[in-house]
Structure formats: C-alpha cells, structure tokens
Design a protein with these regions (language model features):
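Structural signature for extended repeat/solenoid scaffolds and their inter-repeat hinge/linker regions
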Residues: 1-220
Length: 220
C-alpha cells in the first residue's frame, strides 16, 4: 500500500472546521505516488472498510453548521435501528451518516443516540462492527468529539512502548503546529499524566528531537 494511505482520520476533508474541505482533498491526491489516494484505497482495501474510506475521501460532508433537531432525531433513530435493534448490522447506514453529516450535527446525534438507546455510540460500534471498519468508525467518532483529544491519543500511542511511529509523530506535530498543537498538548497532559514535550524528549534524539521540541514549544 502506498505511503499516502498512512495518517489519521483528520487528514480527510471535513474534520478540521478551520480548513477548507476542497483544499484538503487536493492535498490528499498523492500525485508523487503516481495515483490518487482514492485509487490506492480502492486497490488495497475491500468491503465496508473500503466504502467508508472512499466516502470520507469524496469530501461530501455537509458544511452547514446549523443544527436541524428533527434530522438529529432521525439520524440517531436510524443508527439505533441499524445496529442495536437489528439482527446483524446495516453498515451502510453508519457509513452514510458518519461520512456525510457535519461535525456539529454528528455531535448532537451522538448525544441524542445516548438518550434514545442508553448506550454511547462507541459501545454500539464495538458490539456491531469489527476489524478495520470498527477501528475507522471509532476514530471518526473520537475526531468528531474532539480533534485535539483524538490527536493527543494518536501521538501517545505513536511513542508508547518499544519503538516509535516516526511517520505519525512527524505528520501530526508538523501539520498541527500552527493550528491547535497547544490544545493537543493540553489534552495530552490531561489524559496521560505526562506532557507531550517530555515524552518526545525521552523518545527521540538528535536533530530530529530538537526540531520536534521546537515545534512543540515549552514544557507544560
């Protein structure tokens, strides 16, 4: 699979409310690899996982920030019917709603879903899906709830344990350094009882370490 497929769900259009979706979509074309990222996805994945990735790449997420409470109720009920109340799972319903609704709308849907079903949407995804699709849907939910919290978790697990996922570490720190890295640092400290700065300092070395720490800023 081409290197272009590596990254986080926030690389897909529509997750960063401060960035233009079409600009992000163009940035993901991956021309240096001789094909678009969508071509890579179709060539290297299959099933509902492939379908979800393609929907995310197509940048059809509703940009309207207004909340239609009737539509929120309808989507929450549809997800409940497609999962917990169904023998088997209607994966297409999850893919359509998760891949096309606005960020602000989905946050309300997740709240309404909890009210209707008594379950967090993450619990339902865990029970009703599996494998790569489950992991992708959970990543979408995390990023919808909070991009900084999702990326803080991504950075933590890029460095936790033996070895370091240098690609993810560089990608996130560099791409978010002028967007929301301070908020990511706050979430990192809150959720992992250590600072992003100190973990980078202990997990990297040389000029690579110096560059990342410079972008990261001072110790929290």
């Amino acid at each position: 699979m081409a290197q272009a497929l590596r990254g986080t769900v926030t690389d897909f259009p529509g997750f960063d409310e401060r960035a233009d979706a079409e600009t992000l979509r163009k940035a993901m074309k991956g021309l240096e690899y001789g094909s678009s990222l969508e071509d890579d996805v179709v060539g290297d994945t299959s099933g509902y996982y492939q379908r979800m990735l393609v929907v995310l790449l197509q940048a059809n997420r509703d940009p309207d920030a207004r909340i239609d409470e009737a539509q929120v109720e309808q989507d929450a009920q549809a997800l409940f019917q497609a999962g917990e109340l169904k023998w088997g799972t209607d994966e297409e319903k999850f893919i359509t709603i998760f891949g096309t609704r606005s960020v602000s709308h989905l946050r309300r849907v997740f709240d309404k879903y909890m009210t209707i079903s008594g379950f967090q949407i993450e619990e339902t995804i865990d029970r009703e899906t599996s494998g790569n699709l489950e992991q992708l849907l959970l990543a979408v939910v995390k990023s919808i709830r909070s991009v900084p919290a999702y990326l803080a978790e991504t950075l933590y697990y890029a460095m936790k344990g033996a070895g370091t996922d240098d690609h993810t570490l560089i990608r996130v720190v560099v791409s978010r350094s002028e967007i929301d890295l301070f908020k990511i640092r706050e979430e990192f400290r809150k959720n992992f009882a250590t600072s992003l700065y100190s973990m980078i300092k202990g997990d990297t070395s040389g000029d690579y370490k110096k560059a990342l720490l410079l972008l990261c800023g001072e110790e929290d």
